[in-house]
Amino acid sequence: MKIFIQNQQDKVDIDQHISKIIEESIVNTIKVFLEEENFEISVLIVDNSFIKELNRNYRNVNKETDVLSFPIFEFKNGKLLEDIVIMEDEIPLGDIVISIEKAAQQAKEFGHSLEREIAYLTVHSVLHLLGFDHIEEDDRKVMREYEEQILQSMGLTR
């Protein structure tokens, strides 16, 4: 599995520990649903102004958010809905954009560590790449159960 993490902000210091949390969150989420490990995910770490612009451009929502997911293939609840033929070694699942600035604000607001918030946002976003959503209440419950299960497996609880 290839995971690319790029930091494009300077408001919050990002160290190797944060990168490791992101990688572990991705791996632990993927392995719940997919047997193969030949996937690729890109993670972009940004500030609030950058993610606000993306949110406005891609979702027509003119406000900052904590995380955005950009899937490449169509999944539904962890199952691929289309046949794909990839000519490369890794199958690109999609891109994740995390506002580290928003994550730091939320960690403080919720009274837990930045590491826990980053892990949560990463797991949440990977679940979106895998076709989970939280628009309907039943879907939200399923997604929240997976989020908590994966975070607990990493030793990250509220």
UniProtKB/Swiss-Prot annotation:
Its EC number is 3.1.-.-. GO terms for molecular function: metalloendopeptidase activity; RNA endonuclease activity; zinc ion binding. Its main location: cytoplasm. Binds 1 zinc ion. The keyword S-adenosyl-L-methionine does not apply. GO terms for cellular component: cytoplasm. Zn(2+) binds at residues 124, 128, 134. Its cofactor is Zn(2+). One of its GO terms (biological process) is rRNA processing. It is found in: Cytoplasm. It comes from the Bacteria. It holds the Pfam family YbeY. It is an enzyme of class 3 (hydrolase). Transmembrane segments: none annotated. Keywords: Cytoplasm, Endonuclease, Hydrolase, Metal-binding, Nuclease, Ribosome biogenesis, rRNA processing, Zinc. PROSITE patterns: UPF0054. Belongs to the endoribonuclease YbeY family. Single strand-specific metallo-endoribonuclease involved in late-stage 70S ribosome quality control and in maturation of the 3' terminus of the 16S rRNA. NCBIfam families: rRNA maturation RNase YbeY (TIGR00043). This is Endoribonuclease YbeY.
